[in-house]
Amino acid sequence: MSLFIRLFQRFTFQKAKGVDIGSEKSKEVQTNEAEFLKAEFNDISISSLPVDSCLILYLETRIEEIRQCLSVKAPLSAIFLIGSTLEGILLGVASKHPAIYNKANSAPQDTKTGKPRNFSEWTLNNFIDVSYEVGFLKEDVKKFSHALRDFRNYIHPYQQMSIGFQPDEHTARICFQVLKAALYQIEQKSKS
């Protein structure tokens, strides 16, 4: 047994008005959520993606525009831009690797010829599924990308109205994290 003696220190005790654990927990949750949403994938460089070099400037401009939409609290616009940017990147990756994309089991086929459709006829859904199958995306990002695709489809006002979709800043930031995670996984796969 140890005995600690503190010399020349004064302790003051006072009655507490109460203990509010809930407020501390909510601060913790908000901090963790805020940290998650602000997290950056620092090693990502658009120029290192396996896409045509002529596309790089356009992708960088879109990423900057997404950041601007988020900074002025335009979540719906950000989500549309994030979804279309993901589609453009996946099309760019497929265009650099047509053989593996067209041989994938989930590649969309022309019903008359049985051959893979041209990439211009693919949907974001097709690009996500095939990118997962050929290893550019992992399952987690595949699933989140499909959710992003669903949100991006609210670009149609009647569909948005029928569901009552009103995204907030957090939804848009989560979508941006999905895009950044996809960029990271594509970059990592292209290095291997």
Task: Label the model's feature ranges.
Residues L3-L76, Q177, K191:
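Charged alpha-helical initiation segments
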Residues L57-T61, W122-T123, A147-D150:
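Generic alpha-helical secondary structure signal
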Residues K96-S145:
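Flexible secondary-structure boundary motifs
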Residues V134-S192:
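Charge-enriched, short contiguous segments at helix-coil
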